[in-house]
Amino acid sequence: MDTKPPRQRLIGLTGGIATGKSTVTDYLQQKYSVPILDADLYARQAVEPGSEILVAIARRYGPEILDQQGQLKRQALGEIVFNNAEEKQWLESQIHPFVGRCFRSALAQLKQEQTVLLSIPLLFEAQLTDWVTEIWVVTCGPQQQVERLIKRNGLTEAEALARITSQMPLAEKVALADVVLDNSGQIADLEPQIIKAWHHR
């Protein structure tokens, strides 16, 4: 008789920028109380005032990359890295190891949880697919991505497009997904897809 404990379900949630990943995580947390580990949250912690990584960023780009309170000017940094692949790679080389340590620490504390969701926008780009047991990709139309970035982040169309094209093409992520969530419609259209994916083990 097989007495091995059931394998922990680790859902890797990813997708293009501004496709609606946070909508999915919010819904799962509210409906199923699933623990959420968020790479974006860890990345923000990595550059908090006084951190070694923020010091390195200021050393590379100058003190004008910080505001008067010593906080990172995210918009200014974005203008640099989303238009320069080499600088983007350098920044990720600083932040990704910190994010990885945060994930490992959090997962070690959640071993008793049946399911954990890891929200990782750069799941494929950072080669973290081995961390998860299944991959969910959130998708929508490219024009919707642009419009959401303009509205949410206050970007110009050119800036929005630069951020989208700096990432792995969404179609390639979809091809590698176990589950595809189409968020090109309303939340009422998305919810049944999330429920179906949740119950499909």
From Swiss-Prot:
EC number of the protein: 2.7.1.24
InterPro entries per UniProt: Depp_CoAkinase (IPR001977), P-loop_NTPase (IPR027417)
UniProt-listed GO biological process terms: coenzyme A biosynthetic process
Top EC class for this record: transferase
Keyword set, alphabetical order: ATP-binding, Coenzyme A biosynthesis, Cytoplasm, Kinase, Nucleotide-binding, Transferase
Cellular component terms (Gene Ontology): cytoplasm
Reaction catalysed by this enzyme: 3'-dephospho-CoA + ATP = ADP + CoA + H(+)
Pfam families (UniProt xref): CoaE
Subcellular compartments: Cytoplasm
Residues that hold ATP according to the record: A18, T19, G20, K21, S22, T23
Signal peptide: none
Name the UniProt record assigns to this protein: Dephospho-CoA kinase
